[in-house]
């Protein structure tokens, strides 16, 4: 354990469930690394992800962005390819990009957007893009003819969240350099979206536990009841 981590851990009471804003203040205070740490949110939900009707996923545009430069690859042709380039896509192409991904194991991008007519090409990449969470999806707005809008939202700080096999949602809230106020705004936007995405078939307590942490900092537990206030 590093000295800085031990110092940071002293500021956090492991047995306390903090109010959300108090937790954000603490996460900023405990971010002591030399680099700009990412602040992560982990929410354990009262759902059974094995059932299709209890999947929790969605997208939310963070009011203050993620602080991360997002590299976007767009599968499009003709005018839509030009539109993507004009809107700031990092890579634009069709079959040749699919071949590059398959043959070179190339993944220098964070998000993939595709026009619907390109899904025949993109579909072949399901096995490699799927496990990395990179497969375009109409629900998350990444399969669309409106590529300019999709790109603008992604670059502005749109994040996708989804529950994993253990019923936990892991999602970035921003960077520690944002300061407490901006992180609080992002945190509340994320929690509102996750709460609204509650499946109708979910029984009992929906938000079971909530925790915040920076990349190198200790976990800070949040009172799940206070999140719903």
From Swiss-Prot:
<comment type="function">
    <text>Binds directly to 23S rRNA. The L1 stalk is quite mobile in the ribosome, and is involved in E site tRNA release.</text>
</comment>
<comment type="similarity">
    <text>Belongs to the universal ribosomal protein uL1 family.</text>
</comment>
<keyword id="KW-0694">RNA-binding</keyword>
<dbReference type="GO" id="GO:0006412">
    <property type="term" value="P:translation"/>
</dbReference>
<dbReference type="GO" id="GO:0015934">
    <property type="term" value="C:large ribosomal subunit"/>
</dbReference>
<dbReference type="InterPro" id="IPR016095">
    <property type="entry name" value="Ribosomal_uL1_3-a/b-sand"/>
</dbReference>
<dbReference type="GO" id="GO:0006417">
    <property type="term" value="P:regulation of translation"/>
</dbReference>
<dbReference type="GO" id="GO:0003735">
    <property type="term" value="F:structural constituent of ribosome"/>
</dbReference>
<dbReference type="InterPro" id="IPR023674">
    <property type="entry name" value="Ribosomal_uL1-like"/>
</dbReference>
<keyword id="KW-0810">Translation regulation</keyword>
<comment type="subunit">
    <text>Part of the 50S ribosomal subunit.</text>
</comment>
<keyword id="KW-0678">Repressor</keyword>
<comment type="function">
    <text>Protein L1 is also a translational repressor protein, it controls the translation of the L11 operon by binding to its mRNA.</text>
</comment>
<dbReference type="InterPro" id="IPR023673">
    <property type="entry name" value="Ribosomal_uL1_CS"/>
</dbReference>
<keyword id="KW-0687">Ribonucleoprotein</keyword>
<keyword id="KW-0699">rRNA-binding</keyword>
<dbReference type="InterPro" id="IPR005878">
    <property type="entry name" value="Ribosom_uL1_bac-type"/>
</dbReference>
<dbReference type="InterPro" id="IPR002143">
    <property type="entry name" value="Ribosomal_uL1"/>
</dbReference>
<keyword id="KW-0820">tRNA-binding</keyword>
<protein>
    <recommendedName>
        <fullName>Large ribosomal subunit protein uL1</fullName>
    </recommendedName>
</protein>
<keyword id="KW-0689">Ribosomal protein</keyword>
<dbReference type="Pfam" id="PF00687">
    <property type="entry name" value="Ribosomal_L1"/>
</dbReference>
<dbReference type="GO" id="GO:0000049">
    <property type="term" value="F:tRNA binding"/>
</dbReference>
<dbReference type="GO" id="GO:0019843">
    <property type="term" value="F:rRNA binding"/>
</dbReference>
<dbReference type="InterPro" id="IPR028364">
    <property type="entry name" value="Ribosomal_uL1/biogenesis"/>
</dbReference>
